[in-house]
Swiss-Prot record:
SUPFAM superfamilies: DHH phosphoesterases (SSF64182). This is Putative exopolyphosphatase. One of its GO terms (molecular function) is exopolyphosphatase activity. Degradation of inorganic polyphosphates. Keywords: Hydrolase, Manganese, Metal-binding. Mn(2+) 2 binds at residues 42, 116, 138, 200. It comes from the Eukaryota. GO terms for biological process: energy reserve metabolic process; polyphosphate catabolic process. Its EC number is 3.6.1.11. One of its GO terms (cellular component) is mitochondrial matrix. Its cofactor is Mn(2+). It comes from Schizosaccharomyces pombe (strain 972 / ATCC 24843) (Fission yeast).
Length: 384
């Protein structure tokens, strides 16, 4: 089955289920595949590659990947739309979060496979918590779902690397097939997977890059056309990802956002690919938008991780906004515990310290590295 047809079939099955939810007493057997709630290139590509390859093994089930964001938020990710188009995928054939949350409750007993996360943080999906059947991830192991098969959690530049390594025999068999549409599907899967792997590893040049990433990229490159140029592909995708044209600061916060609920504290952690000077110059109402965002999200604490390049040097900054006393307690504990580790240096404080901006000298510490420090800070608050 062509990749596009596979996705279209899953979307049709979900649509039919939604239209007939009140009249149909039974439903087909589903398997769901979901990335994390940031819905970045890695999560979305991983979910599609995993789902298509899983379908080759689970012929009796309908395997449905879904993007863990509302459909309307796809517009905030031009790099994702661009990559989908390169892989001959129509966004109309993608299932989104707002499709899933409307499903009858009985559907959530079907198995779900997690990629690019190893627990379900989004409350909208908590009905799936007893149904986690498999995990492939490259974040810190949270220790749950020990029964999952596979349960692959290891450090790597991109989750898509681990997904492709696991399913490489399937992808290779598709490419070697004499059926032209299967051969083409292998090429489309390879292009789709190469996007996040190259973006997350800086074209295999940054500190996140592992030997596994390099090997899988070499394998995948053998499935793409000979005139495909890796550097050009990476540069175009990077430019799409960096583009902020037409986006408000609120849009930028939602573009790569994760929510955490440690000890009942609501933390929103956004990653924005711009520095503080750019934000102050280009998004004049950013402080009001940040506070409004925190209000709408009912956040106790908002963390904004900024990344910037200056004179070809990569750097990071942090913005902390403490909306509530509980958020302030967590932020203060986090700063006390992590200030030295992250190399945090204050730039500016406002609103009696509720809004603070920091340079982060430890530029290797992305959100993936900062979140475990944040969780350790929760334990400090709880023990007081």
């Amino acid at each position: 089955m062509k990749l596009g047809r596979f996705l279209e079939n899953g979307r049709e099955q979900i649509r039919n289920l939604l239209l007939n939810a009140s009249t149909v007493s039974s439903a087909p057997s589903f398997s769901f595949v979901s990335g994390n709630e940031s819905a970045d290139l890695d999560s979305c590509a991983s979910s599609i590659v995993y789902a298509y390859c899983l379908q080759r093994k689970q012929l009796g089930r309908i395997v449905v990947p879904f993007f863990n964001i509302p459909r309307k938020e796809l517009r905030l990710r031009p790099e994702l739309s661009y990559l989908l188009n390169l892989a001959s995928i129509s966004s109309d054939d993608i299932v989104f979060l707002d499709d899933i949350v409307k499903l009858p409750k009985r559907i959530f007993s079907n198995p779900i496979y997690l990629v690019d996360h190893n627990s379900l943080d989004r409350k909208d999906l908590e009905n799936f918590n007893g149904s986690i059947a498999g995990i492939i991830d490259h974040h810190k192991d949270e220790g749950g779902s020990l029964h999952a098969d596979p349960r692959i959690i290891e450090e790597c530049g991109s989750c898509c690397t681990l997904v492709c390594r696991y399913f490489m025999p399937v992808i290779r068999s598709l490419y070697d097939s004499k059926v032209s549409e299967l051969h083409q599907t292998a090429t489309n899967l390879a292009v789709l997977a190469l996007g996040p792997i190259l973006i997350d590893t800086g074209n295999l040049k940054n500190e996140k890059t592992t030997d596994t990433d390099v090997k899988i990229v070499n394998d995948l490159c053998s499935f793409v056309p000979k005139d495909w140029v890796r550097d050009e592909f990476f540069d175009t995708l990077k430019e799409k990802k960096k583009s902020c044209k037409g986006f408000s600061f609120d849009d930028l916060l939602r573009r790569d956002l994760k929510q955490y609920f440690p000890d009942g504290i609501v933390v929103n952690y956004a990653s924005v690919g711009k520095g503080l000077d750019w934000i102050k110059k280009k998004r004049l109402g950013w402080e009001d938008e940040l506070k409004s965002f925190a209000e709408v999200q009912n956040s106790d604490l908002v963390i904004v991780g900024l990344s910037l390049s200056k004179n070809d040097e990569f750097g990071r900054q942090l913005i902390l906004y403490k909306r509530t006393e509980r958020g302030a307690g967590l932020a203060d504990s986090f700063l006390k515990l992590s200030k030295q580790n992250l190399g945090l240096e204050i730039i500016e404080e406002k609103d009696n310290g509720d809004l603070s901006m920091w340079n982060q000298r430890n530029s290797a510490a992305s959100r993936k590295k900062v979140v475990p420090l944040l969780m350790d800070s929760v334990k400090q608050v709880a023990s007081k």
